[in-house]
Amino acid sequence: NPAAAAQAQENIQSSPWSNRMEVVCCDFRKYHPEDKFDLIVSNPPYFVDALRCPDNQRCMARHTSELNYELLFGHSAYLLSEQGVISIIIPAEVERTVIDTAWKYNFHPHRRLHVFTKPGKPCRRVLLTFGRQSISCIEDSLYIEGEKHEQFTPEYIALTKDFYLKM
């Protein structure tokens, strides 16, 4: 999607890491670079069987029909160096499916962060890092807000202050 790639390039240019990132506009399945990567970061499409929207570009970004977890881990196994890791953010309800899929491609969970909007609410997102080595998984939780709406926790502020103006 050229528009999404242009937006990503614009975001990267205003990032402190702009000299270390590159946007390549192509089908992930057809991407075969000469060198292997040490890190892949992905915010893969979330929706599996949800109602599809009329906007094709938005659908592609949000629904797993174009990039599912099998494809993500299968091709990442090819793209990553032996010590490389893949980090993703997923909806909490697909965590077991994602971990099972990762195992099929010999990826082991290294880090797992459960993200909650506030105390007492169910986990909404899970940030996972996988690698080829079987090591103890570091597990943690993050609460975005305290008891009051938009009363952000110190942990969330520390994590996001460089990216959000409101922090």
Segments predicted by a language model, with ranges:
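Mobile active-site "lid"/loop adjacent to the S-adenosyl-L-methionine
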Residues: 44-71
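SAM/dcSAM-binding transferase cores
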Residues: 121-167
